[in-house]
Regions:
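Multi-pass alpha-helical transmembrane bundle typical of ion/small-solute transporters
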Residues: 1-319
Length: 319
């Protein structure tokens, strides 16, 4: 087994808990919201864990021991110090108060150069804009032939449930191929088999805790949106979020904020529903969208603060 330092272990554990408690709700939240009343949390945990283990082990095999899917190619491994572990600690605090923080910015900012951070920011801004525009256009089309608030016919319900489980599985795998890098950054870039087994156990336990807590406070971002508890709406959100993430996954290996893509998708959807269906007044949507956007800015501000603290105060001659 690789020699692990204290700060490497602390940073990894904090990042693993924070990422699973914060970002995983983006991908599993709508699925949880629409299944909580008919499926036990242990069943959902087992299903999500199966996809999680496949994503980890496939990435490890396909990328020569690198579970980050090559997302850390431009962020070389460096000895983990206390200030690196500070980032996921801050993320943990923000998560507990329900702030949808960009884990990629907050965690990777402690390791990446300013050049890489600039590329991450530009890709994430593009992700928010593309997701919002895409969602607005898609839900404009959906509103032409489908009323999401109308109950699903009993004969169709089983097909929507199956479709949701399939789309959530693909979305969960695609998201993991993006955001596992936020945890793997604390680890050697090539993992041994015994270390991979230990990491898998930590991830599965963290996922169990998240399901037991029903997503925590971050889940409120999903629950307060229009009809997200309905299986049909949840399936459509998961499907188009998967399309957006897969596009950016294939675009290049620069890390990005999946949080920004998710919030952008929900913003575009809410605006489309308000504009084209009359279910909500458009002016009532802007405070909701604005609140989520401001919370994202809090996370970005914390990330910038960490960068300045490390590169200008703690290690002024570093990256």
């Amino acid at each position: 087994m690789e020699m692990l330092t204290l700060w490497m272990v602390v940073g990894f554990l904090l990042a693993a808990y924070s990422v699973i408690a914060n970002d995983s709700v983006q991908t599993l939240g709508t699925w949880m919201a629409s299944n909580n009343e008919r499926v036990s949390y242990t069943t959902m945990w087992a299903a999500a864990s199966a996809v999680l283990l496949w994503a980890l082990w496939y990435g490890w095999y396909a990328y020569g021991g690198d579970i980050s899917y090559g997302r850390l190619n431009k962020i070389p491994f460096q000895e983990v110090q206390w200030y690196h572990a500070l980032a996921p600690g801050i993320l943990l605090l923000l998560t507990r108060v329900g702030v949808p923080v960009s884990t990629s910015f907050l965690v990777l900012s402690a390791f990446a150069s300013s050049f890489v951070l600039e590329k991450m920011l530009m890709k994430s801004i593009m992700g928010y804009a593309v997701a919002a525009t895409f969602a607005y256009a898609v839900w404009w089309l959906i509103s032409k032939w489908l009323d999401e608030a109308k109950p699903v016919e009993e004969s169709h319900k089983v097909w929507w449930i199956r479709a949701q489980w399939v789309t959530t599985g693909f979305l969960w795998w695609t998201w993991l191929s993006h955001d596992v890098a936020n945890i793997a950054v604390f680890l050697p870039r090539t993992l041994t088999l015994d270390l991979l087994i230990m990491i898998s156990a930590v991830f599965v336990f963290g996922l169990y805790w998240m399901f037991r807590e029903k997503g925590g406070r971050i889940q409120n971002i999903i629950l307060e949106k229009h009809n997200t508890r309905y299986v049909r709406s949840a399936t459509l959100i998961d499907l188009f979020y998967f399309v957006c993430l897969y596009f950016f996954k294939e675009l290049n290996d620069i890390p990005m904020s999946t949080t920004w893509v998710f919030v952008g998708l929900l913003a575009g959807r809410e605006l489309a529903i308000a504009t084209f269906t009359g279910k909500k007044k458009t002016k009532s949507v802007f405070p909701l969208v604005g609140k989520d956007f401001m919370k994202m800015m809090v996370g970005l501000g914390a990330s910038v603060g960490i960068v300045l603290l490390i590169h200008m105060v703690i290690v002024p001659n570093g990256l």
